From Swiss-Prot:
UniProt-annotated binding residues for ATP: 118-125
Keywords: ATP-binding, DNA damage, DNA recombination, DNA-binding, Nucleotide-binding
Gene3D superfamilies listed in its UniProt record: 5' to 3' exonuclease, C-terminal subdomain, P-loop containing nucleotide triphosphate hydrolases
CDD domains referenced in this protein's UniProt entry, alphabetically: archRadA (cd19515)
Source taxon at top rank: Archaea
Function: Involved in DNA repair and in homologous recombination. Binds and assemble on single-stranded DNA to form a nucleoprotein filament. Hydrolyzes ATP in a ssDNA-dependent manner and promotes DNA strand exchange between homologous DNA molecules.
The name this protein goes by in its record: DNA repair and recombination protein RadA
SUPFAM superfamilies linked: P-loop containing nucleoside triphosphate hydrolases, Rad51 N-terminal domain-like
Length: 328
């Protein structure tokens, strides 16, 4: 590989300001930053129409900026070997359970959306609490040396659990809680606005994990019935793609939880399915179903992940957090 390509790869791995994009002067850069576009990567993953609307810049100007950003970052066809190398460099966060980590291919990955869905009490929120602590660990211990954003749509966040999980890992609970940015989302519009704001917030605050617990609850409550289904799915689809762009632009792990509903047409096997239909079924890179078992035991099963084999494991929820089951 040429020195020029090596330089491009090195530059694309870190934070590069929009001011470094060829053809972007100070006045245009000011408009981009005011609209929340701080890095070249945030420009690359943006839609031209959306970027023009938010900045007030002409569409043709915006298209040229996006084109220049892509050229600067060397975004073009890659060999399968280059894709492999990029995959090997993706960050992973431990769940606290070795068996669950193995099921996930080494932990919860950056640059993708991981969905945990299941019935009430299946462990979705417990995993989210654990991940928001574990992301702060060093890479040697399964973390990313980063901070977490926790978007709570149902009021299930509990600082007491964070404290207990931090102490179990020998961490200072106050320092751990200082590194978790919490926001309560009160409706779907507020939820969408929070995610939009993260394009500015994430790079400024060393955030490596974004949690949305849960992604569908507001949409489900605000758009009931078949007459609102199309509008709900369109809005949810746009929201999920914004989360995907966030994960890819800033190399963060995005974790969403989801509820389940009964399927009256299923007479054999598991009669439940995740809320959100085809829109949510196709967007997350990894989908994990959680089920209750005896006592504090929970079962996790890979439902959809292109790089993972099908399988399931048992883990437990203890006072200290997510841990391996003795059965594993």
């Amino acid at each position: 590989m040429s020195e020029e390509k090596e330089t491009i790869k090195e530059r694309s791995s870190g934070f590069i300001s929009v001011r470094d994009i060829p053809g972007v002067g100070s006045s245009i850069a000011d408009k981009l930053e005011a609209a929340g576009y701080l890095s070249a990567w945030s420009i690359v993953v943006a839609r031209a129409e959306e970027l023009a609307e938010r900045t007030g810049l002409p569409v043709l100007t915006v298209q040229k900026i996006i084109e220049n950003a892509r050229k600067m970052l060397g975004i073009t066809f890659k060999t399968a070997r280059e894709v492999k190398q990029e995959r090997l460099n993706i960050g992973k966060i431990t769940t606290g359970s070795k068996s669950l980590d193995e099921l996930l291919g080494g932990g919860v990955e950056t640059k993708t959306i991981t969905e945990f869905f299941g019935e009430y009490g299946s462990g979705k929120t417990q995993i989210c609490h654990q991940l928001s602590v574990n992301v702060q660990l060093t890479p040697e211990k399964g973390g990313l040396n980063g901070r977490a954003v926790y978007i709570d749509t149902e009021g299930t966040f509990r600082w007491e659990r964070i404290e207990a999980m931090a102490r179990a890992l020998g961490l200072d609970p106050d320092k751990v809680m200082d590194n978790i940015y919490y926001m309560r989302a009160y409706n779907s519009d507020h939820q969408i606005a929070i995610v939009d704001e993260l394009f500015t917030f994430v790079p400024k605050n060393d955030v490596r994990l974004v949690i949305l617990d849960s992604v569908t609850s507001h949409f489900r409550a605000e758009y009931p019935g078949r007459e609102h289904l199309a509008e709900r799915q369109q809005k949810l689809n746009s929201h999920l793609h914004q989360l995907m762009r966030l994960a890819e632009a800033y190399n963060v792990a995005v974790v969403v939880t989801n509820q389940v509903m009964a399927r009256p047409d299923v007479f054999y096997g598991d009669p439940t399915t995740a809320v959100g239909g085809h829109v949510l079924a196709h967007t997350p890179g990894v989908r994990i179903q959680l089920r209750k078992s005896k006592g504090n035991k929970r079962i996790a099963r890979v439902v959809d992940a292109p790089h993972l084999p099908e399988g399931e494991v048992v883990f437990v929820i203890t006072e200290e957090g997510i841990r391996d089951s003795e059965e594993e």
